[in-house]
C-alpha cells in the first residue's frame, strides 16, 4: 500500500508498506548493487517472532527555508527461528542510477542506494529504536534488512538518515509498541499522518 502525505509548506512524504518499492513512473524498484553489508546482532536471545514478514519504505522531502532535506529508506523484517535479531544495512556506491520520479527530482540529483556516508547513520537510528525497552523482544527472532533507498546529492545528510531509519522501524512495529514521543517533530508528523 502506498500512502502520500502532505507535511505542510510543500513538504511531502510517501510511505509504502508490504508491497513492491518502486516510485510512480519509475519501473525498476529502488534496488541497487550491494558493495558491502553491515551486520550486527541486536538481541542474541530473541524469542520466536509473532511478526510476519513486514516491509516498510519511507520517502520524505522537507523544505527548510532556502534548503531542503531529502531521503528514502526501506527495510524488510523476515522472521526466522535462529534465536537472534539481526540488523543488516546493504551499502551501495555513491554513483548508482539516477531516479527521475522521486519527491526531490526537481531540486536534486537523486540516486538509488545507501552509500557508506549514510550507512552508519542508518545503523545508529535503527539500533536506537530497536534498543528501546521491549522493542527487540516484541519483534523477536529474525532479520531486519535495510536494502532499499535513495539519496540526494544536495538534500541528504547523516542526521536525516539516522532519523529516517528510526522512523522506518517505528512504522514497522507501531501496531505492537507504543510510539516514542521524543522523536524529531518532522518525523513525528509523518508518523501521525501515516496511521
Task: For each feature predicted by the language model, list its residue ranges.
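Accessory interaction regions appended to the cores of large information-processing enzymes
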Residues: 1-195
Amino acid at each position: 500500500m502506498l500512502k502520500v502525505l502532505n507535511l505542510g509548506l510543500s513538504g511531502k512524504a510517501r510511505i509504502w508498506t508490504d508491497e513492491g518499492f518502486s516510485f510512480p513512473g519509475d519501473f525498476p524498484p529502488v534496488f541497487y548493487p550491494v558493495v558491502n553489508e553491515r551486520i550486527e546482532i541486536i538481541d542474541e536471545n530473541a524469542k520466536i517472532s509473532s511478526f510476519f514478514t513486514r516491509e516498510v519504505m519511507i520517502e520524505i522531502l522537507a523544505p527548510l527555508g532556502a534548503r531542503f532535506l531529502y531521503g528514502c529508506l526501506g527495510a524488510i523484517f523476515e522472521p526466522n527461528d535462529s534465536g537472534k535479531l539481526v540488523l543488516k544495512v546493504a551499502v551501495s556506491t555513491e554513483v548508482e542510477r539516477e531516479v527521475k520520479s522521486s519527491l526531490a527530482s526537481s531540486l536534486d540529483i537523486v540516486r538509488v542506494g545507501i552509500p557508506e556516508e549514510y550507512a552508519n547513520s542508518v545503523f545508529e537510528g535503527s539500533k536506537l529504536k530497536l534498543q528501546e525497552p521491549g522493542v527487540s523482544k516484541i519483534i523477536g527472532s529474525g532479520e531486519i534488512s535495510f536494502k532499499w533507498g535513495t539519496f540526494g546529492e544536495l538534500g541528504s545528510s547523516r542526521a536525516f538518515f539516522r532519523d529516517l531509519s528510526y522512523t522506518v522501524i517505528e512504522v514497522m512495529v507501531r501496531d505492537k509498541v507504543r510510539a516514542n514521543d521524543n522523536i524529531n517533530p518532522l518525523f513525528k508528523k509523518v508518523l501521525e499522518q501515516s496511521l
